[in-house]
């Protein structure tokens, strides 16, 4: 797992954009190309290895694959919970199998119902669970600490990042500290792009004491399951989330004065 992922320079409409390549945290073979894994591993540090860990992995998510590997490294038995379907990624299941995890199949249903079923199963069987969307202070602090090193070196006017559920982006935004900076005479702006409800993201940020008029949440016109496979990005970029954020930046870059950093959380396989 590569912790010190690079910041690269990429061109967008004859403009230089800094790109944090957190997708390079995993190699796409042993681990998924995903910048969340250092934070997830920080959560595992505080688990009791005597008890198994179960996690619900929805189709398209790399969480089950990542946890199967990270838990194996820490001697924690991992149970991969999922609802089988014709479209569920066999590639991801096979990657998890390579790490000798156990599988717990569920009947397909709404996400909230599936999560409650897994939670009930865990309580009955003395099995550990991680917070939904990894929403825990240890996870967010890990992201913040890693981002601190980035923003010490790269003083930018705009941070562009996929909102996701609001959890991962919140740790990075806390580090960036948007708004007026009296020392540099700047007004740093955050632009997060969501595929869901804008107010949901603002509420998540508010729950983590992040509230600023310098945070702008925009909803993409593309649906969640539109992977934008025909849209070209100059680096590996996840179609579910990050690709939509880069497309947003391509449409809006002329309105953003100053230096821009795009935080790429996930690549593609």
Question: Model features per residue range: what roles?
Answer:
Residues 1-269:
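PLP-dependent amino-acid enzyme catalytic core
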């Amino acid at each position: 797992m590569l912790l010190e992922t690079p910041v690269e320079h990429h061109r967008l409409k004859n403009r230089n954009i800094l790109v944090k390549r957190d997708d390079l945290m995993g190699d796409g073979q042993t681990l998924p190309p995903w910048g969340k894994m250092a934070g997830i591993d920080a959560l595992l540090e505080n688990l009791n290895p005597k008890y198994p860990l179960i996690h619900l992995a929805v189709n398209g998510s790399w969480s089950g694959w990542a946890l199967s590997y990270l838990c194996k490294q820490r001697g924690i038995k991992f149970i991969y919970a999922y609802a089988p379907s014709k479209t569920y990624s066999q590639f991801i299941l096979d990657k998890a199998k390579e790490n000798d995890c156990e599988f717990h199949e569920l009947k397909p249903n709404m996400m909230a119902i599936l999560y409650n079923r897994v939670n009930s199963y865990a309580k009955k069987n003395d099995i550990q669970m991680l917070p939904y969307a990894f929403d825990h202070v240890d996870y967010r602090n890990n992201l913040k600490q890693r981002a601190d090193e980035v923003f010490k070196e790269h003083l930018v006017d705009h941070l562009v990042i996929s909102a996701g559920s609001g959890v991962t982006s919140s740790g990075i935004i806390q580090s960036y500290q948007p708004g007026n900076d009296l020392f540099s005479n700047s007004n740093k702006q955050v632009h997060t792009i969501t595929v869901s409800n804008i107010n949901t993201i603002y509420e998540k940020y508010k729950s983590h004491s992040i509230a600023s008029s310098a945070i702008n949440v925009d909803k993409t016109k593309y649906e969640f399951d539109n992977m934008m496979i025909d849209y070209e990005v100059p680096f590996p970029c996840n179609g579910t989330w990050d690709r939509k954020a880069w497309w947003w930046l391509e449409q809006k870059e002329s309105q953003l004065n100053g230096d821009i950093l795009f935080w790429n959380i996930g690549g593609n396989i």
